[in-house]
Amino acid sequence: MPRYKLLIEYDGTPFCGWQYQDNGPSVQGALEDAVAALAGTHVRVHGAGRTDAGVHALGQVAHIDLEKSYRTDQVRDALNAHLRPHPIGVLSAEIVPETFESRFSAVKRHYIYRISNRRANLALDLHRAWRIARTLDVAAMHEAAQVLVGRHDFTTFRDTECQAKSPEKTLDQLDVTREGDAVSIVTSARSFLHSQVRSMVGSLVWVGHGRWTIADMRNALAARDRTACGPVAPPEGLYLVRVDY
């Protein structure tokens, strides 16, 4: 039974998230329907990251096990055909060893959060970025972000319904940069807690507006208390960029 690794991009706007749910369409559900159309039977699609409702992906990775062997280009093209009109694209398919697990074999996940720091309404970036009209102090945001880099207890920055056994994570990167009106927050780690990235972004925006100092960020992290967190950034600016193996 060959195992295929899929590289996937999607617009998360119309979906209730990656994971299959009863209350609305999911990316996983759409992919499983497409795989079933190819294979003639239900096949579970295992993803590397369980993105929330409205979150996008440029490089989500999944794996599937098929009873029949297909050429990798056949798998890619068939899935793309059956996925229409969903805003999901299968960029590539490759055969991998049975020991490969899209979620558990991953060694690092990379995300970017996009902010459009302008007064004008969003047109082309509608549902693709968080528009913030008030000018952000990106230098202060980047300095505050470095407080969070390293191994910490991120209880403050995780959802109260997060099911991870431990709140400790090692954050490898958290950089804030600006190019014109575009503010980018780039982060990477082996894994993240539920809502961790958006919670960090929302708190960094408070720093960018002068509502928080760098000391406030340090105190929030040390509090290990969800109520000490700043606002949670909306999902539309977040993208899963790449998963490393």
From Swiss-Prot:
It catalyses: uridine(38/39/40) in tRNA = pseudouridine(38/39/40) in tRNA. The active site is at D52. Substrate binds at Y111. Gene3D superfamilies: Pseudouridine synthase I, catalytic domain, C-terminal subdomain, Pseudouridine synthase I, catalytic domain, N-terminal subdomain. The keyword Disulfide bond does not apply. It is an enzyme of class 5 (isomerase). GO terms for molecular function: RNA binding; tRNA pseudouridine(38-40) synthase activity. Keywords: Isomerase, tRNA processing. Formation of pseudouridine at positions 38, 39 and 40 in the anticodon stem and loop of transfer RNAs. Homodimer. This is tRNA pseudouridine synthase A. It comes from Afipia carboxidovorans (strain ATCC 49405 / DSM 1227 / KCTC 32145 / OM5) (Oligotropha carboxidovorans). The gene is truA.
